């Protein structure tokens, strides 16, 4: 209960912010529990130093810290709802955390552990003897009609395994300060990675405030969770293979999946990466099939197995449920736990707790009459604290010594079965509001009475380790995404360079006849045709001449044309997000900067701004791939990305060279100058040949000079060198991609250079060049498909022939 209080009772250092907050509480509903102020209007334990630090920053400092936190959030890629590949929504992280003192936390912690034990026992009965149904202690009709009751999960857990390994619980505080449960999250409990990210960002943005705070750390909990996953393995217990199963980049939680997998040092995989054979789950890698021991799943029950559950699911693994039954793989959590999330169970839990555990339920569920407590959130615009309603997601993990119900820890100490993360994910909104629907999140600080030990992400090895460097454990899907990341990155760069040159000629339009002809050729190279009547109606104006060409060029920044910048960037982002855990932090920051550039550019700013945007885009793409080159291990994943880059680059160069032969306006040497500038060879050419343009010299530089990284010869050599180091079969014969590369190299090396040297004089030389370019383009176009067939997994997924669900 918060009562009126004299400002003099408040600590002077926090007087301004707290006095204003207290005034706002007085205008609200009286008798409301507040997270920061007690019934006498005094700051609760843990808030004093925090508010003092915030007050001491002053308005300017608080505004700067708020902006710094939001910048770090965006920089680290904390983006949600990214169904549009180039857009997304970021949360706003409140610089004022939610402080929970130790007595409050202990009450919540005890209730959370009890709830995990209760739901675990309830699962065992629902999918086991079903005595609760027989005794009338469950709403039989409602549960049997629920789509979350998975009948094939009956007695599916072998070896006395615990069904609930990780448990998310959404709670609020009511007007009396009592913790109440809004929902249980068991199928794909998300938020741990986000809670950890929020904590790390708070420590970076507010180092003094964080360092001086007596709070419990999160790293120990995640280390415990990782050790629990290891302990779950049936086989290979000394070094089990752990994976995190994600729905993929289309999931709004994909950022967290990648972040958590990276933090726990486990592979991030999708359903298509896995296959079940003889009740064993295997991971498809470049080096062959690798056995999987433990799956930390972030897919809902129904989507995990298209053979026995939802037949239309593309997210799961056919046969996964049978593998779980047979003990071929351990799952966190067991399939079927979705029934425990049913809201209809809420009224039965007090009785079930007495029946199954012999205990009184410590955490009651909220109901429609529950009124929420208030808590402060910092408004950076108004520079004050605003009372609001907070939701909190807590996380509970089973301990490593209690992965089976018959273990010593589980038998001797009920409290030892589970541990709670000392913190969580808090968000602003009405009780029960989904976290992704909120716009403001808070870090949660649980006060500690003693200094907390440091927990390293690296652990002391228990025995000898076999060094590995080749990267054969890379999932083939990841290799494919890296390959296409390289291709789309280079394709985007080539188009940006062509646009840059076209926009430069546009700015010189009607001032130089040659420049006008060059602009037409560049529009041809960009595959930009004259706008039709429908386009003119959309633009609400008939366009001719300069306006027509300017509009056509600036339209390349829209998403109308699939080969325009935005769609190409969308493909780049889709592949980058699918390999997020394989990219370094610095590389990902450049990706964020690219995303910002693409999202904020306004074509109405005109040709000059568009040209600068193209230059910046090329520079940032070079920075991204440069960082990948410097920071990624040069094993198979990097090699596939490199092959993709140089394959697309060489095809782009060959297409540009064909343009010089087919140019209807024949602007002559000026077009060769554009080719040199577009391929970034202008400086190298001038250093060798001064200012004189010779087509034969240009061809030598662009086609045959293997010391020039932008020449066809160099790029073919580089692709060949990378392909020589890829995993291959034991066959003595060359595979399809090797034969295609030999074909392209042979065409280049057997070219009649003397004949090509008369390019400017004879049509025969032009015919010879065209034949050479065609002889290069044909096998290189086929090379991409050959690589895909040899190295990337394209497996037809099994489907149900007969429906086997509850709604059958």
Task: Describe these PLM feature segments.
Residues 78-163, 174-176, 186-242, 248-257, ...:
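Alpha-helical transmembrane segments and their helix-helix packing motifs
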Residues 167-173:
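Two-metal-ion RNase H-like nuclease active-site motif
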Residues 12-39:
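Short acidic, Pro/Gly- and aromatic-enriched capping/linker segments at domain boundaries
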Residues 24-27, 35-36, 199-200, 248-365:
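Conserved N-proximal alpha/beta basic substrate-recognition cap immediately N-terminal to
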Residues 181-185:
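Short hydrophobic beta-strand that contains or immediately precedes a catalytic carboxylate
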């Amino acid at each position: 209960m918060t009562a009126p209080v004299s400002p003099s009772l408040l600590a002077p250092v926090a007087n301004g912010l707290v006095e204003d907050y207290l005034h706002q509480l007085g205008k609200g509903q009286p008798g409301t529990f507040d997270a920061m102020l007690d019934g006498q209007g005094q700051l609760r334990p843990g808030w004093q130093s925090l508010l003092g630090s915030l007050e001491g920053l002053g308005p300017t400092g608080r505004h700067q810290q708020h902006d710094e936190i939001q910048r770090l959030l965006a920089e680290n890629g904390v983006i949600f709802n990214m169904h549009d590949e180039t857009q997304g929504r970021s949360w706003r992280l409140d610089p004022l955390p939610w402080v929970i003192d130790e007595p409050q936390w202990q009450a919540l912690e005890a209730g959370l552990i009890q709830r995990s034990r209760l739901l675990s026992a309830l699962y065992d009965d629902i999918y086991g003897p079903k005595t609760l149904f027989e005794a009338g202690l469950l709403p039989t009709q409602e549960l049997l009609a629920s789509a979350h009751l998975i009948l094939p999960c009956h007695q599916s857990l072998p070896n006395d395994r615990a069904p609930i390994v990780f448990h998310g619980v959404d709670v609020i505080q009511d007007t009396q300060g009592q913790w109440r449960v809004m929902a249980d999250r068991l199928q794909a409990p998300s938020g741990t990675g986000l809670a950890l990210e929020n904590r790390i960002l708070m420590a970076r943005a507010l180092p003094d405030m964080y360092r001086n705070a007596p709070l419990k750390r999160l790293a120990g909990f995640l280390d415990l969770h990782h050790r629990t996953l290891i302990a779950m393995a049936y086989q290979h217990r000394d070094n089990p293979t752990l994976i995190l199963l994600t729905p993929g980049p289309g999931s709004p939680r994909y950022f967290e999946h990648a972040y958590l997998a990276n933090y726990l040092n486990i592979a991030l995989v999708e359903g298509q990466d896995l296959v079940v054979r003889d009740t064993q789950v295997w991971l498809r890698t470049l080096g062959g099939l690798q056995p999987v021991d433990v799956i930390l799943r972030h897919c809902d029950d129904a989507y995990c197995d298209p053979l026995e559950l939802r037949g239309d699911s593309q997210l799961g693994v056919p046969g996964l449920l049978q593998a779980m039954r047979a003990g071929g793989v351990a799952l966190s959590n067991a399939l079927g736990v979705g029934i425990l999330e049913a809201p209809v169970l809420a009224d039965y839990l007090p009785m079930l707790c007495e029946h199954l555990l012999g205990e009184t339920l410590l955490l009651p569920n909220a109901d429609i009459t529950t009124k929420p407590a208030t808590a402060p959130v910092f408004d950076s615009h108004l520079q004050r604290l605003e009372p609001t309603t907070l939701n909190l997601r807590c996380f509970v993990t089973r301990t490593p010594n209690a992965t089976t119900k018959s273990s010593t820890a589980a038998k001797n100490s009920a409290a030892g079965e589970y541990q709670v993360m000392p913190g969580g994910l808090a968000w602003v909104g009405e009780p029960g509001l989904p976290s992704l629907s909120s716009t403001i999140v808070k870090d949660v600080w649980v006060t500690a009475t003693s200094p907390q030990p440091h927990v390293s992400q690296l652990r002391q090895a228990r025995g000898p380790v076999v060094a590995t460097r080749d990267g054969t454990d890379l999932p083939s899907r990841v290799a494919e995404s890296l390959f296409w990341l390289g291709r789309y990155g280079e394709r985007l760069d080539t188009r940006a360079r062509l646009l840059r040159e076209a926009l430069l000629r546009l700015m010189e339009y009607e001032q130089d006849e040659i420049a006008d002809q060059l602009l037409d050729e560049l529009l041809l190279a960009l595959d930009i045709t004259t706008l039709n009547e429908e386009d003119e109606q959309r633009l609400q104006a008939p366009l001719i001449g300069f306006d027509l060409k300017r509009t056509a060029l600036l339209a390349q920044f829209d998403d109308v044309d699939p080969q325009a910048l935005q769609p190409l960037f969308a493909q780049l982002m889709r592949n980058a997000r699918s390999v997020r855990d394989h990219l370094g932090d610095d590389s990902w920051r450049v990706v964020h900067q690219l995303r910002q550039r693409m999202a904020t550019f306004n074509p109405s700013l005109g040709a000059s701004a568009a040209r600068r945007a193209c230059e910046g885009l090329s520079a940032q793409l070079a920075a991204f791939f440069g960082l990948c080159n410097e920071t990624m291990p040069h094993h198979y994943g990097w090699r596939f990305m490199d092959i993709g880059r140089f394959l697309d680059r060489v095809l782009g160069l060959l297409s540009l060279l064909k343009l010089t032969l087919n140019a209807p306006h024949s602007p002559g040497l000026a077009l060769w100058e554009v080719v040199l500038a577009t391929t970034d060879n202008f400086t190298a050419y001038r250093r060798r040949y001064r200012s004189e343009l010779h087509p034969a010299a240009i061809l030598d530089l662009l086609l045959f000079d293997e010391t020039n990284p932008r020449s066809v010869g160099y790029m073919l050599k580089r692709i060949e060198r990378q392909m020589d180091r890829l995993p291959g079969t034991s066959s003595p014969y060359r595979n399809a991609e090797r034969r295609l590369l030999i074909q392209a190299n042979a065409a280049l090396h057997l070219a009649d250079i003397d004949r090509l040297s008369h390019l400017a004089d004879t049509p025969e030389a032009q015919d010879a060049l065209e034949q050479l370019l065609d002889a290069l383009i044909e096998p290189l176009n086929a090379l991409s498909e050959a690589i895909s067939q040899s190295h990337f997994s394209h497996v037809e997924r099994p489907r149900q022939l007969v429906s086997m669900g509850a709604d059958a």
